[in-house]
Amino acid sequence: MCIRDRFARDLLSIVDGRLVWESLVERVSSISGPVWLTFDVDGLDGSLVPATGTPVPGGLSHWGSVELIENLFASGNCEVVGADVNEIVPGTEGSLTEFSAALIATKIVACHIANSESKIGE
């Protein structure tokens, strides 16, 4: 599988954003083999992560990110062997960035635990 860039404007476009989003979710669901999941918080909307190297207006929403993570783990085609959440630049903006990153990390861990438990039950 190759790596592709996705632009927020393509995902959020009123005209065809939903189709592009569904295509992205489908691609994530079809990933197979061992996967290292790297989540750069600067891909989130800048209002969620003001303390990052490159805050992006119009980036991914929290719930969009959760949907992608859940679909990756639920696909059954891949095994997430590790993960990291990065691009956090602690500053004086408060703790919103760290909190947003912690929510994403918690979702990754929860999905990993749920996958591990479902494999034990098989």
For each predicted feature, which ranges?
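Conserved small/polar residues in nucleotide/adenosyl-binding loops
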Residues: 1-5
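Catalytic cores of soluble, metal-dependent hydrolases
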Residues: 6-122
